[in-house]
């Protein structure tokens, strides 16, 4: 059994014993998880039935493939020719600039946990006091996910699509309720 992004979506637990296997998406005794009306947190897990002779590395490989599956790829030229977005497609790429954009996306703050994975606290708004002493959640309001979508279209780099999917799933499960 492997739970998709279990660490990012904690608390999670998997238990195996002589009576069977249990996947605990919200384990007992973890404290309160408060969900508002309309929230519907999607959780995915894979059960892989295999022979006892299967090697551990093969089982691990199945889990890794499940955690990071193949994704479809559309070449940046196809996006550009389609004309469905602003022209973010340079004639010549500058490696230093591209690396800095990737580093900015990779360094974007992230919050973890079942209700927070895919979101982040907006430190600027929080410091300004807009939350009345409480953190102000960005709820991925447009900028970061939109930038990731454009970056995926213009480069085809998978990490941008992965970041976008995590944000979109958070929107669907938590923010749009």
Describe the predicted segments one by one.
Residues 1-177:
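Catalytic cores of extracellular degradative/oxidative enzymes
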């Amino acid at each position: 059994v492997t739970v998709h992004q279990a660490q990012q979506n904690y608390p999670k637990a998997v238990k195996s014993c002589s009576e069977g296997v249990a996947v605990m998406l919200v384990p007992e005794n973890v404290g309160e998880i408060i969900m508002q009306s309309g929230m519907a947190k999607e959780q995915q897990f894979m059960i892989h039935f295999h022979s006892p002779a299967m090697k551990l590395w093969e089982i691990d490989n199945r889990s890794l493939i499940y955690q990071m599956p193949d994704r479809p790829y559309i070449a940046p030229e196809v996006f550009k020719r389609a004309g469905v977005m602003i022209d973010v497609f340079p004639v010549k790429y500058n490696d230093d600039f591209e690396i800095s954009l990737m580093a900015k996306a990779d360094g974007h703050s992230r919050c973890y946990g079942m209700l927070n994975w895919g979101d982040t606290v907006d430190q600027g708004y929080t410091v300004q006091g807009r939350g009345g002493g409480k953190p102000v959640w960005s709820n991925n309001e447009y900028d970061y996910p939109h930038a990731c979508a454009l970056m995926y279209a213009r480069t085809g780099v998978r990490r941008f699509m992965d970041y976008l999917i995590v944000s979109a799933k958070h929107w669907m499960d938590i923010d749009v309720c």
